[in-house]
Design a protein with these regions (language model features):
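Intrinsically disordered, low-complexity regulatory regions
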Residues: 1-96
């Protein structure tokens, strides 16, 4: 029998924020970067530069936060998105 999944009472609103992040990422797949069959990020990863690219963008948006258009939530979403791309790249490079 399957156990009923326990409802977690997140202290930092993680459940809602993860849903918001997924919605943000979903919208990027309809944006100008995805008009072609392949995204430029795919080529960068395939050329072996994915980790540097992703982590460089994490740093870029972290340093920009609070400077361009104030304390912009979009910069934080971009940090999280690029961190996920870095995690994907890590997993791809370290498959067993």
């Amino acid at each position: 029998m399957f156990k009923k999944k326990e409802q977690i009472n997140y202290k930092f609103n993680e459940g809602a924020l993860i849903k918001e992040l997924q919605s943000y990422i979903d919208k990027t797949y309809g944006g100008h970067y995805s008009k072609n069959q392949f995204q430029s990020t795919e080529f960068i990863i395939d050329c072996g530069h994915g980790m540097g690219f992703a982590l460089g963008n994490v740093l870029k948006y972290a340093q920009r936060y609070g400077k361009k258009e104030g304390y912009n939530r979009a910069d934080l979403m971009k940090i999280l998105h690029y961190a996920l791309i870095a995690l994907h790249t890590h997993d791809k490079n370290h498959e067993n």
